[in-house]
């Protein structure tokens, strides 16, 4: 099965690497094309477009200026180790074994506003460009128009390479909107994580993001191959609570009682 997750805004380019091996992004030509447009923007324009502070706008303008497509371990880092956010807190890739990284490389991909689709060991230079950004390019008025169906084609290629036809959607709605479900050459499954709040079950953003990372780690470390095996997910108090047919495919519901959440969380 092929897991799809979102990237993160927070990046880490300083901590020790858990693995030295690396690969190159497969959609680098498109990233170069996109960078030609991004580099025409001033820091003030970036700040307005991305709705970020002057400080962050200046930082990312400098990143875009320094960006060049010859990625090496000296100027880039493996994507799975560079992203640091709630999903990646749950994923804990820094604890992976070599065998875990091997499995992840075949069965996990990260969507990206700049790089399209990244495999775990693909090098990337630091950037910030969210998929929902309304950046005007020759292809249209936003990044969804820029990427068109190319992200879906890349996912289908990875499905073919990894040997089965199951896609596990663990990405946010913003990022999965860049995928065309009807064109996916595989069964689509979406785990949904809900936590108890004020006596009812709700999707709580922080917990749901972390749970998506934990589900990814569960699949990777258990080397899961079959959709039914996902229902055994029980990390940090979650339990399978049922299955429904959503608009785009099967939805697996996992719930957690408030009492199952550690006070340290």
Swiss-Prot record:
Disulfide cross-links: none
One annotated GO biological process: response to hydroperoxide
InterPro entries associated with the record: YaaA
Record-linked NCBIfam families: PRK02101.1-1, PRK02101.1-3
Residues annotated as transmembrane: none
Family: Belongs to the UPF0246 family.
Gene Ontology CC annotations of this record: cytosol
Protein's UniProt name: UPF0246 protein NT01EI_0662
Organism (species): Edwardsiella ictaluri (strain 93-146)
Annotated Pfam families: H2O2_YaaD
């Amino acid at each position: 099965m092929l897991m799809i997750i979102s990237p993160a805004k927070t990046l880490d380019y300083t901590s020790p690497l858990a693995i030295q091996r690396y690969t190159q992004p497969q959609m680098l030509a498109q990233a170069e094309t996109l960078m030609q447009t991004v580099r025409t923007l001033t820091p003030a324009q970036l700040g307005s477009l991305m709705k970020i502070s002057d400080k962050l706008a200046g930082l990312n303008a400098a990143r875009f200026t320094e960006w060049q497509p010859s990625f090496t371990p000296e100027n880039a880092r493996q994507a799975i180790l560079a992203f640091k956010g709630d999903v990646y807190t749950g994923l804990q890739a820094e604890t992976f074994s070599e065998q875990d990284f091997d499995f992840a490389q075949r069965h996990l991909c990260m969507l990206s506003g700049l790089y399209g689709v990244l495999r775990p060991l693909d090098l990337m230079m630091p950037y910030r460009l969210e998929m929902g950004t309304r950046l005007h390019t020759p292809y249209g008025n936003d990044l969804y128009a820029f990427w068109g169906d190319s992200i879906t084609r890349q996912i289908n290629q990875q499905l073919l390479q990894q040997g089965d036809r199951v896609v596990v959607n663990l990405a946010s709605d913003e990022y999965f909107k860049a995928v065309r479900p009807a064109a996916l050459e595989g069964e689509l499954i979406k785990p949904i994580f809900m936590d108890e709040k004020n006596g009812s079950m709700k999707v709580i953003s922080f917990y749901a993001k972390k749970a998506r990372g934990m589900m990814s780690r569960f699949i990777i470390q258990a080397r899961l191959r079959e959709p039914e095996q996902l229902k055994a997910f029980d990390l940090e108090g979650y339990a399978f609570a049922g299955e429904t047919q959503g608009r785009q495919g099967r939805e697996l519901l996992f719930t957690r009682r408030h009492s199952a959440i550690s006070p340290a969380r």
